[in-house]
Amino acid sequence: MGPITLNAIEECAPKVAAVTMAAIVQQESGGNPLALHDNTTGQSYRPASLAEAARLARTLIQAGHSVDLGLAQINSRNLPALGLDADQVFAPCSNLRAAQVILLGAWSQSGGSLRGALSAYNTGNATGITGARYSARVYAQAGVVVPAIPGGILARWIGSDLAQPRPDLPPVQPRIAWMPEASPLAPNGSGLGPKW
């Protein structure tokens, strides 16, 4: 599987801002579409193939384990409601679509708070310290220090040249690629966290 592009994120999860979805994916799997985390045992797996990932997921689910699967770490208990099985959930676009469905529900649950929605995405609850910590980690993955004012507009005195594309700069096309040998991320109970 090749790297997940920003275009793929926008195509597969168009109702979620691409930078938000990319930050969730980075926090959850580091961009590894075959990542598995067994919440029951705390064990994380990095299968070498789709067949191995699906086989392992089926085995763990049949044993009654709660397992997070794929790019956005979709929980196995959500699969029936999402119409997915252990094979389909590892397809990057299917996984991103499922993440979109869960995040949209979390957005509604949180009353339109992104931090609350991220909390609910991770814990099922829009409030609480565990969800707040998760939300902060997702924001950090997005590189957000000071976010934009929602719905904000530039002051009238700002020159229009700032809004014009610069022809001397190539267009930005970020790509998310899981690089196991370069990734500081290692599995933990809430997704993939830093190895210290």
Language-model region placement:
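Export/targeting segments at the very N-terminus of extracytoplasmic proteins
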Residues: M1-T59
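Second-shell loop/turn segments in exported
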Residues: N7-E11, N39-R46, L60, L82-C93, ...
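Solvent-exposed loop/turn segments at secondary-structure junctions
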Residues: E28-N32, S76-A81, G124-A126
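Cell-wall glycan
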Residues: T40, Y45-R46, L50-D68, A72-N75, ...
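Catalytic and substrate-binding regions of cell-wall glycan-acting enzymes that process beta-1,4-linked
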Residues: G42-Y45, A51, S94, A98, ...
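Alpha-helical segment that forms one wall of the substrate-binding/catalytic cleft
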Residues: S49-G116, Y139
